[in-house]
Amino acid sequence: PEVEFIYTDEDKITTLDQPRFNPHFKPDFSLDFLRANNYICHFSVFKKELMDKLGGERSKYDGAQDFDIILRVAENTKNIIHIPKVLYHWRVHPNSTAQADTQAKPYAFEAGIPAIQDHLERVGLKGTVEHGASLGTYRIRYQFEGTPKVSIIIPNKDEKETLKTCVDSILEKSTYKNYEIVIVENNSTTEEIFEYYK
């Protein structure tokens, strides 16, 4: 299939004669992670025909236009490529959101909430979006019909006591009833762990 969206890793820079810093090595595309924070941010390239179809930037999301576009693109294509190389240098200055510890543009983080909320509505998910624990992150409180089954996946290799503590804690403390515990066995060798599995 033809690629419709490319994004790259990035770092930050103050001036051309200063060293670059704070590299951001991004993961490959993850819609769930994207909904939690705009980890893609810069540098993004979109296929023109797709952008024409989507209508480009929308002023409703001023400060988070890139986030809105990335979410809309993700709704319309699976042909997304991450190039794991630093190909973008984000210039840091006092009025830039490049300074992660600043409130230089709080409206940018506020605009992320309706961008995600509208995305959820477009894809048919019910939930409420709020700010996460860290600046620039978001939490979605999904609304479910009924009590869907939750799979708790625990990888393990020869860790009987740790695994037992984990499983016992789930069994004792969980107030949710419709769940399963899946233990992913990773080449354990001790008899003790296989006895515990029984």
Model regions and ranges:
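Short, acidic, metal-binding catalytic loop of nucleotide-sugar glycosyltransferases
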Residues: 168-178
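A structural helix-start
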Residues: 156-164, 190
